[in-house]
Design a protein with these regions (language model features):
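Non-heme di-metal
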Residues: 1-103
Length: 103
């Protein structure tokens, strides 16, 4: 349902806002609506990718070795899947994500 909502936002809602803004002479506003629509499209893509991972049971298990990081305490595990429980802080598997250096 979330992906469908994002689809509606970028294909219909913000495009209609942009058209109305253009018709009323607000070209800069129309451009901003289209920029927001592009963001909403990316949101849809992310939701659909997550859904594929959930359906394939690949959220916490990967075919390749990954570095998993506990979002609570920062504990690192290297392997194909996240542990059931963090050995450091005892938080459940749901707290683990594939580590990404984004700095």
């Amino acid at each position: 349902a979330a992906a469908e909502g994002e689809n509606y936002e970028w294909t219909d809602m913000y495009e209609n806002f942009a058209k109305t803004a253009e018709e009323e002479g607000f070209n800069k506003l129309a451009q901003k609506f289209r920029l927001v629509a592009a963001i909403e499209k990316r949101h849809e893509e992310r939701y659909r990718a997550l859904l594929r991972n959930v359906e394939a049971q690949e959220v916490f298990k990967k075919s390749e070795v990954k570095v998993w990081e506990c979002r609570n305490c920062g504990h690192i595990v290297v392997g194909t899947e996240a542990p059931e429980i963090c050995p450091t802080c005892s938080h459940p598997k749901a707290y683990f994500e594939v580590h990404v250096d984004n700095f």
